[in-house]
Structure formats: structure tokens, C-alpha cells
Amino acid sequence: QGDSNHENIAPSPVSVTISSREITPAITLSGSGLTEANGVYSYIYDGTAKTPTVTVTDNGDEISDTEYSVSYRDNVNAGTATVTVSDNNGGNYIVNGTATFEITKKAPAFTPPAGIPGLQYNGEAQELVTAGVCYEGTVVYSVNNGNYSTAIPVGTAVGTYTIDYKVLGDANHSDTVPATLTVEIG
């Protein structure tokens, strides 16, 4: 409504567009079995896909999970896994980012070798132990501080033999610390 110095103007619609705000999200991971130390998240390998819960924040404010989708890559075997947060169109925010977590190798389960008791000298090479069994790596042996080998240790001469053994883990299982047993040929 105009006054004596201004004309009347008819109202007209005004169009306003509110754009989504692009953020650089802080991504936090959580979930059963997930540990965090010094900013590094990790699980221990167990053969299952790891899908930690993802929380996204912007300057400390949590962003609704309807704003983004989550996908996982390399999240089954030991190594570094990636969590990708991808924007869902039409929200209040544009949210894109990644986080990583580690899947650490698990200690292998194995049956250790056992020394064969009562061995007597017979002039021929004799196996000194029953074989260790491991399906999550390879059992290797060393006789009297020699090189490690997958061959079952043998001895011929009368005496005491020191057998060191360990498991060389596979891609998802760690190596074990060497252990020692002694066997005698009388």
C-alpha cells in the first residue's frame, strides 16, 4: 500500500531456493568387537563381514542417517577396510567421506607336534615328532637351531635333539612364537 509519495504495488510471489549445505563430515565407527586405539579402529579376523555402525557429525552435531548411505569395501579378510559415506540427494546436507578400519590377523588354532618317546638307535633316520596340525597356516620345524622346514624332523645318532616349531600363519592368521621340545634317541 503506497502513501502520498509512493504508488500502490500489487504483491507478487517470490521464489526462494535453499540449497543443501556441503559438509566435511567427521565419521565415527562403533560396534560389537570393534576396538579403537589412538584413532585406529580394528577388529580381529573371524571370517565374517565387518559392518560397524557409522555416525556422521558436523562440528559436533550428529547428521541424520537419512542424509547418507553407507557401503563397505575389503571388510572380510585381514587388512585395511574402507567405509564410504555417500550423499542421499534431497537432504539438508551434502555428505561424502570415507573412514578406514583394520582387520587384524587372528592367532591360528593348531595341534602342536609331540615328541616321540622311547626312540632307540637303529642306524636309520627316525622321525622325532608326530606332525603338528594347522589349517590356518603351516607348521615348520627346526632341529638343533637349524633352518626351519615343513619336513618332519628326523635323527639317526644317539643323543638329545632340540626341536623348535612354529606356525607360519596364512593371510588371515598370524605367525606363532617358536616353541621348543626335546627328544632323545637312546
Predicted regions and their residues:
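Solvent-exposed beta-strand/loop surfaces, strongest in extracytoplasmic domains of secreted
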Residues: 1-186
